[in-house]
């Protein structure tokens, strides 16, 4: 090769330099790439090791949840109110259906027929081939799940899966629905005790993790497996007594029907000494096993109103919320004259009145700061009256005077003491208070601020509050405060949970009665009890006499408060109520009944005395014997009391006549024999004293029916005679004190209905037309 003048090969120098530069750049790039790769490997293997390991495991293993058994809810005597049982969840794996080329139409068709799920819905889910988990049906009962297993086995379908779950059952349906509450599809509590104590009842779920194949199926010999056992939830025993709850629901439901109640009803039965709730009812009710379904009446009303599907859904959701709402703790209302118990207690405690005090009611009175005279409910007034009579008459004017004797500042202090105001709370909350009952959804009271209420130049708020108006409280607040008035003066915190037990039955916690404070003295409480007993026991003066039960000493107070005026008809809406306690000399229980908007077309005067008091009387008549409270009859009660028909079939006529005479009953013989072969009414029936029992001698009663007469307005004695002439019998649901004076206000079988001979008709009595005016 020719060389240049300097002896070098032409072009050699620049080429070599280019080579060196290229090698250098390649080295730098190689080192840089190595460093990047090393950094990335460090990031993956060191920094993100745990993350990628978890991801790898997630691809190689499948986790199955082991559901915890939710704790059982019992009543105070061990009756099961809520329980869980094993069910299954059926789901499909669209990815596996695709992988194994399974017939998704056949799968969708078969599951639809077995589970009752829409075919198109299942088919659409089966088409989501990127998914390994699509739920077809939850809470599937074992017998149905077994059909799915057979369908899966026969078809050899890998893509159909079944996993264990639990379902909540409520053996008593709607009993104590608002107290117990319910759970959702995921077994999370959504209302009542189920929600308030969800963390206690739910326990902790476990899991099983197993190695899987690329197809997502379990490996025969798992190289990876982990198991964490579930911890079952704890169980709860309530203070609720299922028997008492049933009594209260039965009579409250009947009242809603009898008085055509438009906006539901509520009732509470409480142990006065402890605050334990024996029964809490809110109507309308619903079945806990089907809590999303509203009543047929509500559905029909919504259907008649809704103009579109969207509006229907909105109205349906509102109806659900309304039926789930617990009126006993969530609704506030003006208590009306039932609050006079509180005014009475504070006045007696302060010594500004005594049982010897007297008052005059002219029908109205002027109040400082009020533009118009304040009227009593009784037109023309009650005239002169003692303190006891003022309470019996439920006189508004007398109680305005009593409130003024107490004074606005002391009245406000006692309102706080009885739990209606909380001045220790934040400023934004100082006009309200709650009892703190262990149940979600409790509302607070609504009270005047202290500066407005305690204005000495305007006593209108004090005047209205003295007889239970211009403020709102909840039913649970009222019964708690009234219990304090009659139990010796102790304000107790109401509660529903008696104890919590683990899955082995060991008691974890026990609720002890909690004294909030003593509000009045035992002496004052005794005076309150004595006066309130006269409201029920005095059949001529007391507005609460319809709560009377023969043989039992019951005290109480009526209440009737106005809500609003209906826009179309202009009619007023009322809440009528009655709160009673028994035995009056040593109270064990208190019962509050509240009826929201009774109909004026029911035939009964709208008032607490005429509507709510009889309901409480019927509840007391069932509950007190159940609690072991023995009746103590006066001579007059024994003479007027209804009689139980003895068994005389098989006796000679002479023996039968003697047995019936001893029972306070008469008889008439039908037939020519010497031995009683049958009788009407049957043994065990309770009928009016002196009623005529039919004795059949040698023959049996011939089936016969009569048309039920209208007994309303008749005296008890006249009703007995009217029914007796038809071969029917009468008994008084709320007891008899004077068969000539007491009048029938309601009957168990409606007029015009057919009724068989020998049937016993239960009637409700009130004293007379004059006493019927004692409505508040």
Predicted regions: what they are:
Residues 3, 82, 88, 214-227, ...:
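Beta-lactam-recognizing serine transpeptidase/beta-lactamase-like catalytic domain environment
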Residues 1-306, 323, 332, 409-417, ...:
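Periplasmic/cell-envelope proteins involved in peptidoglycan metabolism and beta-lactam response
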Residues 121-131, 167, 261-274, 360-364, ...:
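Acidic/histidine-enriched alpha-helical segments
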Residues 176-178, 276, 341-342, 479-482, ...:
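Short, solvent-exposed alpha-helical surface patches in non-cytosolic proteins
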């Amino acid at each position: 090769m020719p060389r240049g003048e300097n002896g070098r090969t032409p072009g050699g120098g620049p080429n070599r330099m280019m080579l060196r530069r290229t090698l250098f750049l390649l080295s730098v790039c190689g080192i840089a790439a190595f460093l990047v790769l090393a950094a990335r490997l460090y990031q993956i293997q060191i920094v993100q090791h745990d993350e990628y390991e978890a991801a790898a495991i997630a691809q190689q293993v499948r986790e199955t949840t082991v559901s915890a058994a939710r704790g059982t809810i019992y009543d105070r005597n061990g009756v099961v109110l809520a329980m869980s049982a094993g069910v299954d969840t059926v789901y499909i794996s669209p990815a596996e259906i695709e992988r194994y080329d399974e017939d998704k139409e056949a799968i969708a068709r078969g599951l639809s027929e077995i589970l009752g799920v829409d075919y198109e819905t299942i088919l659409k889910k089966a088409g989501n081939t990127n998914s390994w988990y699509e739920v077809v049906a939850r809470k599937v009962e074992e017998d149905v799940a077994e059909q799915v297993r057979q369908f899966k086995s026969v078809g050899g379908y890998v893509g159909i899966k079944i996993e264990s779950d639990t379902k909540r059952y409520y053996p008593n349906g709607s009993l104590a629905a608002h107290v117990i509450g319910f759970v959702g599809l995921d077994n999370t509590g959504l209302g009542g005790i189920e929600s308030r104590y969800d963390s206690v009842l739910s326990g902790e779920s476990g899991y099983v993790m197993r190695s899987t194949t690329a197809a997502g199926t379990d490996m025969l010999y798992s190289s990876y497996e982990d198991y964490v056992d579930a911890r079952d939830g704890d169980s709860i025993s309530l203070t609720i007594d299922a028997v008492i709850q049933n009594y209260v629901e039965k009579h409250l439901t009947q009242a809603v029907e009898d008085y055509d109640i438009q906006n539901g009803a509520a009732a509470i039965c409480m142990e006065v000494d402890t605050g334990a709730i024996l029964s809490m009812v809110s109507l309308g009710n619903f079945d806990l096993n089907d809590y999303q379904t509203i009543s047929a009446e509500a559905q029909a009303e919504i259907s008649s109103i809704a103009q579109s599907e969207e509006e229907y859904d909105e109205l349906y959701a509102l109806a659900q919320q309304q039926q789930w709402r617990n009126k006993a703790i969530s609704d506030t209302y003006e208590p009306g004259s039932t609050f006079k118990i509180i005014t009475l207690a504070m006045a007696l405690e302060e010594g500004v009145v005594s049982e010897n005090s007297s008052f005059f009611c002219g029908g109205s009175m002027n109040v400082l700061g009020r533009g118009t005279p304040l009227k009593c409910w009784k037109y023309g007034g009650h005239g002169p009256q003692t303190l006891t009579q003022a309470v019996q008459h439920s006189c508004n004017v007398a109680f305005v005077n009593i409130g003024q004797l107490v004074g606005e500042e002391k009245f406000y202090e006692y309102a706080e003491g009885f739990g209606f105001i909380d001045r220790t709370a934040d400023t934004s909350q100082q006009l309200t208070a709650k009892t703190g009952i262990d149940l979600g959804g409790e509302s607070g009271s609504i009270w005047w601020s202290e500066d407005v209420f305690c204005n000495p130049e305007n006593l209108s708020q004090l005047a209205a509050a003295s007889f239970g108006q211009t403020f709102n409280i909840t039913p649970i607040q009222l019964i708690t405060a009234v219990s304090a008035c009659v139990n010796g003066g102790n304000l107790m915190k109401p509660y529903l949970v008696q104890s919590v037990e683990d899955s082995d039955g060991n008691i974890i916690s026990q609720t002890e009665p909690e004294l909030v404070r003593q509000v009045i003295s035992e002496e004052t409480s005794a005076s309150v009890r004595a006066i309130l007993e006269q409201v029920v026991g005095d059949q001529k003066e007391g507005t609460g006499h319809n709560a009377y039960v023969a043989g039992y000493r019951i005290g109480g107070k009526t209440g009737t408060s106005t809500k609003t005026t209906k826009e179309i008809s202009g009619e007023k809406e009322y809440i009528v109520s009655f709160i009673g306690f028994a035995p009056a000399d040593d109270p064990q229980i208190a019962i509050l009944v509240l009826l929201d908007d009774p109909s004026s077309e029911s035939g009964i005067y709208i008032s607490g005395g005429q509507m709510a008091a009889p309901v409480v009387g019927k509840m007391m008549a069932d509950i007190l014997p159940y609690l072991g409270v023995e009746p103590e009859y006066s001579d007059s009660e024994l003479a007027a009391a209804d009689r139980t028909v003895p068994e005389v079939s098989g006796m000679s006529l002479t023996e039968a006549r003697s047995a019936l005479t001893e029972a306070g009953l008469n008889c008439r013989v039908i037939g020519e024999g010497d031995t009683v072969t049958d009788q009407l009414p049957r043994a065990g029936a309770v009928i009016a004293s002196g009623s005529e029992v039919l004795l059949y001698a040698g023959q049996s009663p011939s089936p016969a029916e009569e048309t039920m007469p209208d007994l309303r307005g008749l005296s008890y004695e006249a009703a007995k005679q009217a029914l007796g002439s038809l071969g029917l019998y009468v008994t008084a649901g709320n007891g008899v004190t004077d068969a000539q004076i007491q009048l029938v206000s309601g009957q168990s079988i409606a007029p015009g209905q057919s009724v068989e001979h020998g049937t016993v008709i239960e009637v409700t009595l009130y004293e007379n037309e004059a006493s019927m005016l004692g409505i508040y």
